[in-house]
Regions:
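A short, charged, Gly/Pro-tolerant segment at domain boundaries
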Residues: 144-148
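Alpha-helical cap/lid subdomain in secreted, periplasmic
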Residues: 1-121, 125-143
Length: 148
């Protein structure tokens, strides 16, 4: 792997998050950390494997606590949603489709990371719910429910 493409979860990643937090606060912003979305990593129809981001999630949670920054745990919410949907039904949220399904993307795709529109809306709604649950300034930034 190319070491310029990643950081170590419990060192440079945490340092980078703390830099973002400090810069946000220095500019009178209200930082909030949002854990990464889980990838589709099913071992069978209903059981997810250990996610690729689990160390980064733990590091982010530690950073949030240490720096007194609110956190939306999208990782846990998305894991629960994936387990509920199951391996087959969760494909509809990700770039997972057969050859010829899309004119602009005619080849087959089994991408368990990137989202289709429905997946983006589904997981973004979890972030909105998490921000609403934080209350205060975070909830105040949200629009009332709208139909997409």
């Amino acid at each position: 792997e190319d070491p310029t493409r990643y950081t170590e979860p419990f060192s440079t990643y945490m340092e980078n998050l703390e830099t973002f937090i400090r810069v946000a606060r220095d500019h009178s912003a209200y930082p909030v950390l949002i854990t990464p979305l889980e990838r589709r990593c099913f071992m069978d129809e209903k059981h997810l494997g250990i996610g690729a981001h689990s160390d980064y999630v733990a590091a982010m949670k530690q950073t949030a606590e240490k720096n007194n920054v609110p956190l939306v745990d999208l990782y846990s919410m998305s894991r629960m949603e994936l387990k509920k949907a199951g391996e087959k039904n969760s494909r509809r949220w990700y770039m997972f489709f057969p050859e010829g399904e899309y004119k602009n993307h005619p080849e087959k795709s089994e991408d368990n990371t990137h989202l289709r529109y429905d997946g983006a809306v589904n997981f973004a709604s979890m972030i909105a719910r998490g921000l609403r649950e934080l209350g205060g300034i975070y909830a105040d930034m949200l629009l009332d429910d709208i139909n997409l």
